[in-house]
Amino acid sequence: MITALDHIAIAVPDLERAVARFLEDFGLQHDGNEVVDAAKTTTAFFSVPPTHIELVHPLDGGGPIATYLEKRGGGLHHLCFRTDDIDADVARLREKGYQFTSDAPTPGAHGSRVIFIHPKSCDGVLIELSQPAEAHS
């Protein structure tokens, strides 16, 4: 079951500049960066209780974030909902006709399992479902 808005992700062409903006200009708490190999990104995390903001930047100029930046130059990339049973939610949504960008959940940040719902199924918005690892629930 979906339990919360987990985060809002913003694709950024310059990660250092974006991190500085969120730290210095907006005064947000920077929780660190993590390379997410499965997504081909470096992600910077900011706490904005009760949710988070993630700044996503492509690794080595490849992957879906690089494609997004080439087309749009940065901006809101996706919304992520936290779930306590990603497999059940995927099955339930598939039964309702939702399309996903992959066949099954993949590894996400902090040991989570994630899957994206295709924007065509959600009025043009890319939606991520994320089941946190036990340590981060």
Question: Could you say what each language-model-derived stretch is?
Answer:
Residues A4-D6, L28-K40, D60-H77, R92, ...:
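A cross-kingdom feature marking solvent-exposed beta-strand/loop segments within repeated
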Residues V19-A20, A66, D87-A91:
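Alpha-helical elements of the RecA-like P-loop NTPase motor core of helicases
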Residues M1-V19, G74-T83, A133-S137:
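N-terminal beta-strand motif that seeds the catalytic metal site of vicinal oxygen chelate
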Residues V36-H52:
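C-terminal "cap" of GNAT-fold acetyltransferases
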Residues P50-I53, D60-G62, I86:
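Short, charged/polar surface micro-motifs in flexible loops or helix N-caps
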Residues L5, V12, F22, F46, ...:
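Short, structured motif recognition centered on aromatic/hydrophobic residues
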Residues A11-T41:
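N-terminal first-folded block
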Residues A44-F45, F81, V90-S137:
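Vicinal oxygen chelate
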